[in-house]
Amino acid sequence: MSMPAFSELRFVAVDQNDPLAEPLLAELAVEYASRYGATEEAVSKWLRTHPADEFAAPNGGMLIGLLSGRPVTGGAFCRFDAETAELKRVWTDSRYRLRGHAKALLAELETEILARGYRNVYLTTGDRQPEAEALYLSSGYRRLAEPLPAEGEVFPVAFLKTLN
């Protein structure tokens, strides 16, 4: 009987307040603050204002990808409407990017979203995150044409994917 490699990416379901989610929220605060000109404290507070129960069953979830026990990628989803889940907080540790972890995360989130009965995935990202836009496009998401309202100098870019 062979054992799985210790360095194999493994996903666990957590809630927003789980210590495994802390690196996700902390690095997202740094990333968003640097790209959009806010303070880390303000972004951190904003990230935590989303009610944690919206990222919990039965309508939502949060997954963290562990590599050798260390959180390296993660993301959440919540109910958008009866047939659509909305992705939130998609993140990969900057030291582990460009290794396929984000695509593996999206696939795992989509599997969980399908299991919850949703058929579509909606998301927005900021216009200063071209890497995120490239990830979503290369993962089968379609950029929506209609412009979304700007939030200050931030222009959200929306994507949609129908799951099979």
Regions found by a protein language model. Give the residues of each.
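Conserved GNAT acetyl-CoA-binding A-motif
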Residues: L106, I113-T125
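Short coil/turn segments at alpha/beta junctions that flank glycine-rich nucleotide-binding fingerprints
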Residues: E83, R99, A115-R119
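Residues that form or flank phosphate/diphosphate-binding pockets in enzymes
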Residues: L20, G100, E131
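Acetyl-CoA-dependent GNAT
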Residues: P4-K88, D93-S94, L106-E108, E112, ...
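Active-site acidic-Proline motif in GNAT/NAT acetyltransferases
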Residues: D93-R99, D127
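Conserved catalytic-core motifs of GNAT/GCN5-like acyltransferases
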Residues: Q16, S44, Y122-D127, E133-A158
